[in-house]
Amino acid sequence: MARKKIALIGGGQIGGVLAQLAALRELGDVVMFDIVEGLPQGKMLDIAEVGSVDGFDCNLKGTNSYEDIKGADVVIVTAGLPRKPGMSRDDLIEVNSKIMTSVAEGIKANAPNAFVIVISNPLDAMVTLCQKITGFPYNRVIGQAGVLDSARFKTFIAWELGVSVKDVNAMTLGGHGDDMVPLVRYASVNGIPVMELLEKKYKDKAKAKEVMEAMVKRTRGAGGEVVALLKTGSAFYSPASSAIQMAESILKDQKRVLPTCAHLNGEFGVKGFYVGVPCVLGENGVEQILEFELDAEEQAMMDKSVAAVKELVGSMK
C-alpha cells in the first residue's frame, strides 16, 4: 500500500509545526513548498534528522517548485502574511488574495485530485478564493477555523471550572472573526451543561452568565490576544494542530465530527458561502454537514456572523 502524501504550502511558523506533527503521526510523506530558497529545505532537513529520536520514518522534502506537490492526497495552505498587533484578520485581504491566487493555480496544475485545507487569513475569504480558482468540488476544499476556535473555547471553560480539557465539549459556528458564534447552550463537561456547573459554582445565575460572556468574548479575541503577546506574528502551534486533526480524519477516513469552514447550500439558512459548521470529515472530504436547530439568540448571532463573511468575500471581488 502506497504511503499517503501531504503537501504544505508555506514554510513559515505554521508550516514548520505542520511538518513536524505530520511526521510524528506518520500520516505520510511530507513536502513543504515555499518561494524562499533554502527555507523549506532547511526546515524539512532539520525535522528529518530526528526521525530516529522521535520514532518516525517518512520522507520529508523542502522545495521551491510546485511540481513537487504532484500526487498529494492533502494540501494544507498556510501561505500569506500573518497578523501584527492592532490588525484584524480582515486587514490582510488584499495582499493575501494575491498570494492565494498564485497558490491555488499551483495546486490546480499539480495536485488536481487533492483535498485542500486552508489556514491562511482572512480564512473565510481565502478558502472561497481557493475553491473558485482551483474549481475543485466543494467537498474537497475546506478551511480550518472552527476546530481551533472551539479548542480555545474549551480551554477557557476547563480553566474556569478546574477540570480536564479532555472532558469539555464545546463548539463555535460561523465566520473566523470577531462575530464567531460560541454555542453556550451546547457546551458541556462530560454531558453536564457548563452553565449549570457555573451556576452551582457561583450560586448566582447572573454571575454565571457574566463569567460565560467573558469566556465567549475571550474566545472571539483569542487569536488577537496571542498576536498582542507575540508582537511579531500570530498563533502557529494551535492552528497547525487543528489542521492536522482535520487532515488525519480525511486521510484515515475517521468520520470525525469537526467544526469546519465548509460551503453551504441552504444549511443553517445559508446558501453559496463558506461558513463554519459541524461536518463529518472522511475519505471524501466533507461527507455530511450536521444541521440542527438554533434558538433565536443563536440564530441572530449566526446571521450577524454570516453577514460579516458575505461582506468580507464581497470586498475581495
From Swiss-Prot:
The active site is at H176 (proton acceptor). Substrate binds at R83, R89, N121, R152. One of its GO terms (biological process) is lactate metabolic process. Keywords: NAD, Oxidoreductase, Tricarboxylic acid cycle. It catalyses: (S)-malate + NAD(+) = oxaloacetate + NADH + H(+). Catalyzes the reversible oxidation of malate to oxaloacetate. This is Malate dehydrogenase. It comes from Citrifermentans bemidjiense (strain ATCC BAA-1014 / DSM 16622 / JCM 12645 / Bem) (Geobacter bemidjiensis). The lineage of its organism: Bacteria, Pseudomonadati, Thermodesulfobacteriota, Desulfuromonadia, Geobacterales.
